[in-house]
Amino acid sequence: MNNDENYPESRKDGTVEEIFGVTVEDQYRWLEDFTSPESTAWEQNQNKFTEKYLKKGPFTRKIGKDLEKVWDGESISTPYVQNDRIFYYFNEGDWQHSKLMMKNCLEECEAEVLIDPNSFSEDGTFSLGGTSISPDGKWIAYSISDGGSDWRVWKIMDIESRELLEETINWSKFSGAVWEKNNSGFYYQKYSEPTDELLADINEQPKLMFHKLGTSQDEDELIYENPEQPRWSWSISISENNAHKILSISDGTEEKNRIYIKSNDSENFIPVIDELIGEYGYITSKDDVLFFYSTENAPNGKVTALTIKNGSYVWNDVISESNFAIRSVNIVNEKIVINYLADTISKIKFFDMNGNHLNDFNFELAGTIGGFGGGIDDKETYFNFSNYVTPTKIYKINMEDFSYDVFWEERLADHNVDDYETKLWFYESKDGTKIPLHISSLSNINIDENTPVLLYGYGGFDISILPGFSKRFLSWMNQGGVVAVASLRGGSEYGAKWHEDGMLFNKQNVFDDFAYAAKFLHATGIGSPETTAIEGRSNGGLLVGATMLQNPELFKVALPGVGVM
């Protein structure tokens, strides 16, 4: 941007605080009141200035045309099967929201629209949240979000007739709908109705409720609460034989939880894991054996089983921790499917229910594999694959012999995978830690210090940043740019320790990892500070904001999206 451009004024006030003995100036504190007339006017002036600049840019029209081209294409989600029906989300490419589709068969038949979120509101601000189908396949509970809010309104629809029941469920947040095995209703998490503005109230003291079909929410049954622990929140699962209810209790955002269990022969939930000693994620059950993913004494993850018999609870590890972090665990056709991460690349292994290794899934490409959802008795399931240059492909796999065929693949106009290349590099951060860095571009360009570079990062909340196809990144590469994605500490790429090394008092490690990614790129002859942009969203927005202040000399442009700052 030219130096003679007149930026809109940003007023500075005199706010000064002492935090942990450090004097901190916060000259823009007034912007935290984002509903004030002054903040609103500031936002409008900033947007007007930005739009004026972008319209003058010589590349805006070219980039816009390329974005239109790459965005013009269908997309679907990985299907899941229930009650001999196939469900998936579908978008023709120009819909604001994907539609939930349903096939009334397991082979070849026409798909029909089950729920169209584009019909929820004229301006498209209402979106479809979670969905849950009753065990008998008659009902679907689905939630609606207004303007991206975490608050959800649940509705219930008859799948055959498409008729909605009269009742709605309000003030639900961070919750699914878990059906009773007899199809009588479902469990959900409810908060008290806010008394203040929705964005100002603190959400505490949730209740686990049961909603019975055909009744109003006022009649819902309270299943569990703990007023002495206002930060706790709940999710519930039910064993396959309907004998045990598994209550997972979280405390804030920590990736550890408690497990309480209520069996049919007990009146109350009994604490089985009552300390925050690790993450315990319920997978499924066989008879009275419950299977969990756990990080207790296993930072990379393991599979463990809880046998419930005559009021006793006995734990046994089924698959021990390995050198690779576990990304996901599924049990399909009585086979345990583990998705390991080997330097951010998916490695799939199959085991029997006793933990004996059956087979390695030797997929022909390197990248990210997801899916393998389904029930313990399902004979088939679906998985997906992509990387930074390969559009998404979805496969149907036979879980008897592990053979698979393409179910659907993303097709883009004039896109040839062979025209691009992606490589995994490693660099050393400030403290010597080795960090993965995926670098992608057109294969025929000459990369030097003049090459535009987009450096992306996240680094937090136990979320892995893995190879995946992005139309935004593709458009950047089509303009001759390099996309560099760093898998920073704070995520789960290398297990729980990798996460802990980038959180709380270790957060500076994440900022250092990101800065040293830029230094590595420039030292390798990939771009320069004058040609580098950094980008991140949410926690990644915080990352970019911190990097703007700590290392402004390493880049020209910063894009902090919806940062948690």
Model-derived regions: residue spans:
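A conserved short beta-strand
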Residues: E553-G563
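Conserved acidic residues
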Residues: K138, P452, K556
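Cap/lid segment of the alpha/beta-hydrolase catalytic domain
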Residues: N118-S134, I144-S149, E163-E167, I397-S538, ...
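Hydrophobic alpha-helical scaffolding
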Residues: L198, R231-I236, K245-S250, Y293, ...
